[in-house]
Amino acid sequence: MKILITGAASFLGRHLVEYFLSKNEEVLALARENARGMEELLKYKKNTGFKLTVLNMKDIEKLEDEFDICIHLAWGGIGKTGRMDKDIQTKNIVAAKNLMKLCKKKNAKRLLFAGSQAEYGQTLEDMENIYGKDFDINAIENQDENSSTNPKSEYGRAKLELKTELKKLGDGLNIEYVHMRIFSVFGRGDHETSLVSSCVNNFMENKDVYIGECLQSWNYIYVKDLCKAIYLLTVKELKNNYVFNIAGEKNQILMGYVRDMHRILKSKSNIIVEKREAPTEGTPFLKPSIELLKELGFKEDYGFEGGIKDMCAIK
């Protein structure tokens, strides 16, 4: 099958390109000009199953190639300011709808869209108001695909709007729509300022780590496990389900992940906790259920510890 991946130069996009090529699938990678990560894509140019197209999403109708499956990752305004910019997020909505229409013209049968945990909008502040500051994480229900949604950002609201709009549009065009609610992904090539990247870099050099309280529930999925999950969503019969949480099998307090990294890397660093101001949209509180994904046969190959060891080349 031939897979179109938009946002292919992104952290997730590059790993998906590599994964699908390893499965001997054809990959049509779409990336905007001067995209960060473009050089990483160029190393696949000698692969006969790979084609790179440099094109902005606003010009998506100019794409010439046909494809069977589309994985839509491209999205503007993912930074702190952009997440709250309604105009930017509205442009993302328009682009996604245009892509669905293009899928019809290109005879594609399924479109997978990168939704987000931000659609739920559940925050640490919400949980503390309900359960108190000494809450028991195990007493709080997991977020399944039918849990209530209350996005706190324009980014989350746009992703949630497309859950309904793309499903309706896809049904009318006879294209199967899959809405992937992706949680927190880590791995080699992620931004150096991400929590995992910064902790790993400092712990490996035995440098002290200055960090917030990390009291919220969290869920990490290793990028190679995420690729496996997305691959299953391209090839499996989905039994009329179309919204899937894409996350790891383990939920725990975020500080637990920090201490796990410290242990795995056998670091001598000090973990110095600082009181920090909560983000504008609140402190995300992630506690997903992935039972629907497991029904498709998903099981982590790496998990958190295996992922840290793999990205750091530790046996």
Locations of regions flagged by a protein language model:
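Conserved Rossmann-fold NAD(P)-dependent oxidoreductase catalytic core, especially the SDR/UDP-sugar
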Residues: 72, 97-154
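NAD(P)-dependent short-chain dehydrogenase/reductase
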Residues: 125-135, 160, 164-218, 223-227, ...
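Glycine-rich NAD(P)-binding loop of the Rossmann-fold in SDR/ketoreductase-type enzymes
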Residues: 87-95, 149, 153, 157-158
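Conserved glycine-rich Rossmann-like NAD(P)H-binding loop of the short-chain dehydrogenase/reductase
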Residues: 25-36
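SDR active-site strand-loop-helix element
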Residues: 6, 30, 70-76, 111-117, ...
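NAD(P)H-binding glycine-rich loop region in Rossmannoid oxidoreductase-like domains
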Residues: 53-91
